[in-house]
Amino acid sequence: MNTQELWFPIIERWLAQTFLGNQRIYLAIDRTNWKRKIILMISVIYKKIAIPIYFTLLAKLGSSNLTEQTKALSKIIPLFKNYKIVVLGDREFCSVSLAKWLDEQGVEFCLRLKKNDFIELKDHLWCEIKDLGLKPGTSFFVSDATVTKTKQVKGFNVACKWKKNYRQHKAKEGWFI
């Protein structure tokens, strides 16, 4: 018996006891270093806490790649067949290819974009995200955008927010999701 055969039924039972069918569940995908080991982990966000449900050790240093990410997600997506899931990822997971793959799986996603990514505002008018005019204390939304000049993937919604400066707390940059 392997870990998945033991662990996944426990996860499925917990999901059934905790969430209603067809309920939206948020999953965070993240990579971390632990004692010179690289761990790719997927967690359920429940009551503002990330509960790990799957992890894999990567046999390398550095960032994960699309193949490793989709392999990990492929293992856990079937556990959520009765739910709507949204995958959340930071800048390591800002791949347009990952977004397309998630969309093909019927999975919603919020993936942080890099500030030097381009979006098409109008026909053939491209703008680097950092040049959209986002300033501390502001936010805006771009709907149905085409993302990245090289891949030109249509139909993305891009949310932009830069936290307001408050006393000693100043966010260094805005977020583009």
Set out the residue ranges of the language-model regions:
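Single, function-defining residue in the core of a domain
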Residues: 3-14, 20-25, 36, 46-177
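N-terminal accessory alpha/beta regions
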Residues: 1-4, 31
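Acidic (Asp/Glu)-rich catalytic clusters
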Residues: 43
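An active-site-proximal beta-strand-loop segment
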Residues: 28-40
